[in-house]
A protein has these predicted regions:
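PLP-dependent aminotransferase class I/II
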Residues: 1-130
Length: 130
């Protein structure tokens, strides 16, 4: 870790630049909601997570053409076993429930290129243009 920590600022800067490129190329796809960054916050973009209409179909399509995606948060927090004792009603968390059904992580790593981001974005656009 000592070796890697020297590169953390550079890697975060590269991820932030990649996120800007994704935001640019995906901006006009109405079926995709981009990550929101709130005022006075700093996003490291460890993941680049969008909300996608018909997420599972999009994920399957992208995976079938060798574009790796991920669903990093498949359950809303109140549905996790560690919260069972709290007897939480999922109906009280509609945004968490809907997000868990629509979020999709797109390829993100410090060395991702603009060409790769453009390729991923064009395939997403093609999927929704069918």
């Amino acid at each position: 870790l000592d070796v890697k920590i020297r590169y953390i600022k550079k890697w975060i800067d590269q991820r932030r630049l990649a996120a800007e490129m994704y935001n640019h190329y995906l901006a006009e796809i109405s079926e995709i909601s981009l990550p929101k960054v709130h005022k006075n916050t700093f996003h490291s973009y460890h993941l680049y997570v969008v909300e996608a209409l018909h997420r599972d179909k999009l994920a399957t399509y992208l995976n079938d053409i060798n574009i790796a995606t991920g669903i990093h948060y498949p359950k809303p927090l109140p549905a996790l076993d560690c919260y069972k004792s709290h007897k939480l009603d999922l109906a009280e968390f509609p945004r968490a429930v809907s997000s868990a059904k629509s979020i999709l992580s797109l390829p993100m790593f410090p060395e991702i290129t603009e060409d790769q981001i453009r390729h991923v974005s064009s395939k997403i656009k093609a999927h929704y243009s069918k």
